[in-house]
């Protein structure tokens, strides 16, 4: 048994230290960190935009043909719901294979990974942020609006800071999952 450990130690030293194979591990770690950070940024941007569309639709309840803005908000909400349902309903590996071999065939592999993981993370982040926004008391929006603030200003200055505070643990979990 002791000879086996000595042999494993000798092979480890020969492979990783003497033949400089440890550089493969550090190169892989660099790529992993780059892909994770870029996908995280893309996922946060997508998630916040989609959550805002979904929450605006849920809070205003627009009718289809009252105005062109209502029509586009309904259409954007339907597209966002479809995106979230499809992306959250398919495995990440399947998404990676489809984007790599069907959609972005000639792209670099790191670019494909960033886009795929960013799109996947965006769907989860959207639901996390939407849950945080919906968790803020309705009176907060009414208070901001009664002070003369616009809907966008009320969301930006009053609702989103409270929502991000309550959604932060779930967002950190999503970031760890992305890693």
Regions found by a protein language model. Give the residues of each.
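Transmembrane alpha-helices and adjacent helix-loop boundaries
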Residues: 1-179
């Amino acid at each position: 048994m002791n000879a086996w450990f000595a042999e494993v130690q000798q092979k480890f030293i020969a492979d990783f230290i003497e033949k400089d194979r440890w550089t493969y591990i550090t190169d892989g770690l660099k790529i992993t960190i780059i892909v994770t950070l870029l996908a995280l940024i893309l996922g946060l941007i997508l998630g916040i935009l989609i959550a805002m569309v979904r929450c605006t639709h849920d809070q205003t309840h627009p009718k289809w043909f009252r105005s062109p803005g209502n029509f586009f908000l309904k259409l954007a909400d339907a597209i966002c719901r479809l995106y979230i349902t499809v992306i959250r309903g398919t495995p990440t590996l399947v998404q990676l294979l489809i984007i790599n071999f069907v959609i972005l065939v000639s792209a670099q592999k790191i670019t494909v990974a960033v886009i795929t993981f960013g799109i996947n993370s965006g769907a989860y982040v959207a639901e996390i942020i939407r849950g945080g926004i919906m968790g803020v008391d309705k009176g907060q929006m009414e208070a901001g609006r009664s002070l003369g603030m616009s809907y966008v200003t009320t969301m930006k200055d009053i609702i989103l800071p409270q929502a991000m505070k309550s959604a932060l643990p779930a967002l950190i979990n999503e970031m760890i999952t992305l890693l």
